[in-house]
């Protein structure tokens, strides 16, 4: 959330509509394959076996018959050094509605990170990224795309923590913001999309 300091929310920047904002290197597994195809790839190649193991590609995988989702976002966290994490259960509709309506309060100038706990099911996910568009008073003020990585199906959830970000400062930066977040893979499949709100304030309240 690198909203420019001392920038008016009424100043519309058309460059922020561009979909090229990106944090982190691109990750690609090449042509998309099924889990079985990945399992059969060069079984005698030790380096490839290590690569597949790093993605969690095993003989068992994880494919629950009662849940066809491939990426399941379990928890979202606001992480600030010296403060208790603010956790949101993304599987609970009431909690998701709460962050849409009320959201978080972030002290101006503070450094924070976003944590995500998620599970991958059924197939390998290539180039998963978190794309976020922030608006204030209806105008886009920030847009970012953060690479999370490529993962194989596993019953054990994965954890990802973003690089540190800094809340804007100054009287003009304070106020209410709305963010649209979505988790997208290399094939442009949107696996999860949600809306959350936050207020930049002089104190944590």
Swiss-Prot record:
Its main location: cytoplasm. The modification Phosphoserine is found at residue 63. It comes from the Eukaryota. Pfam families: Rho_GDI. It is found in: Cytoplasm; Nucleus. One of its GO terms (molecular function) is Rho GDP-dissociation inhibitor activity. One of its GO terms (biological process) is Rho protein signal transduction. GO terms for cellular component: cytosol; membrane; nucleus. Residues 1-31 are annotated as: Disordered. Keywords: Cytoplasm, Nucleus, Phosphoprotein. Residues 1-11 have a biased composition (Polar residues). Belongs to the Rho GDI family. Regulates the GDP/GTP exchange reaction of the Rho proteins by inhibiting the dissociation of GDP from them, and the subsequent binding of GTP to them. This is Rho GDP-dissociation inhibitor. It comes from Schizosaccharomyces pombe (strain 972 / ATCC 24843) (Fission yeast). The lineage of its organism: Eukaryota, Fungi, Dikarya, Ascomycota, Taphrinomycotina.
